[in-house]
């Protein structure tokens, strides 16, 4: 018996090493696909909630958001979304604005260039930044308007989700879209600050300030990839939403992402199935060989 185990041990260890290696290799992809599934479900739930509303509801929530923006005036914040403390926002005025599902989702952002769609949550707590984009408290709510500047933050380089990992691929002229209630707001990238020290509050504050007559949205994340000692800011200014042309870009992005997600999922399942089948065949063969040796010894 001991001799048989000694013979099998190298194969077992090799199999375990292979499985561990496969797990490490597949984890980022599997985790990202899992997060994208939940992000898609969150966006779908938001769209269903919005679809059940009528024009009066839209108008009421939109006016509340514009009133909130008027009351806060110029952006007020500590300069870094990732240093904001997590607060219990439920019951606050901020939480009640642009929150049709009472789940903290105020809309979602679509970035066709990098094939990314993320729900936008109230605030930038760590819990929020792990699963989507967060609206930076103290900046304008993302409903547009002259003299408004909304800041949306998300992590970059998480092993479990891509989020804003690829926004360094954006260049001036690229567009992104903010979906809020029954409206789609289009923004064109016009400024990129690729490397700002996280403690350089003067530069960060200047980059995210309100500018009279302008309607801005800034995408805020950490950099360099995996180091996170600096901040990357991608700013876009409001441009007309071209309806059919822009919808085509959004639809193509969504369809392409769905196809990629399914192919990746099927590939992972196929590899897992192949490993399982191989292991089962090995077990069956070993049992047959063991039975044969026992019968031969009788």
Annotate each predicted stretch with a short phrase:
Residues 2-106, 255-298:
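Extracytoplasmic entry segments of secretory-pathway proteins
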Residues 7-11, 24, 30-42, 121-292:
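Extracytoplasmic/periplasmic soluble domains downstream of a signal peptide or transmembrane helix
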Residues 93-141:
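Extended boundary segments
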């Amino acid at each position: 018996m001991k001799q048989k185990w000694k013979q099998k041990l190298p194969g077992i260890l090799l199999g375990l090493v292979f499985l561990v290696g496969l797990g490490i290799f597949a984890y980022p992809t599997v985790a990202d696909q899992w997060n994208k599934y939940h992000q898609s479900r969150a966006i779908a739930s938001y769209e269903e909630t919005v679809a059940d509303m009528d024009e009066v509801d839209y108008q009421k929530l939109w006016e509340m958001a514009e009133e909130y923006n008027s009351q806060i005036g110029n952006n007020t914040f500590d300069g870094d979304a990732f240093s904001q403390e997590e607060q219990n926002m439920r019951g606050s005025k901020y939480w009640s604005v642009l929150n049709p599902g009472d789940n903290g989702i105020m809309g979602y952002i679509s970035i066709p260039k990098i094939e990314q769609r993320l729900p936008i949550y109230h605030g930038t707590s760590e819990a929020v930044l792990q699963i989507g984009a967060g609206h930076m408290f103290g900046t304008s709510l993302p409903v547009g308007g002259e003299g408004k500047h909304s800041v949306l933050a998300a992590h970059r380089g998480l092993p479990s989700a891509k989020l804003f990992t690829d926004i360094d691929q954006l260049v001036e002229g690229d567009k992104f879209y903010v979906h809020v209630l029954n409206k789609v707001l289009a923004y064109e990238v016009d400024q990129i600050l690729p490397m700002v020290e996280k403690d350089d509050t003067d530069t960060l504050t200047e980059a995210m300030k309100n500018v009279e007559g302008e309607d801005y949205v800034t995408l805020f994340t950490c950099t360099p990839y995996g180091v996170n000692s600096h901040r990357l800011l991608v700013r876009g200014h409001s441009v007309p939403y071209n309806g059919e042309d822009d919808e085509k870009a959004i639809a193509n992005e969504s369809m392409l992402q769905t196809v990629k997600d399914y192919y990746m999922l099927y590939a992972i399942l196929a590899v897992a199935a192949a490993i399982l089948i191989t292991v089962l065949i090995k077990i069956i063969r070993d049992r047959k060989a063991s039975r044969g040796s026992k019968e031969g010894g009788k």
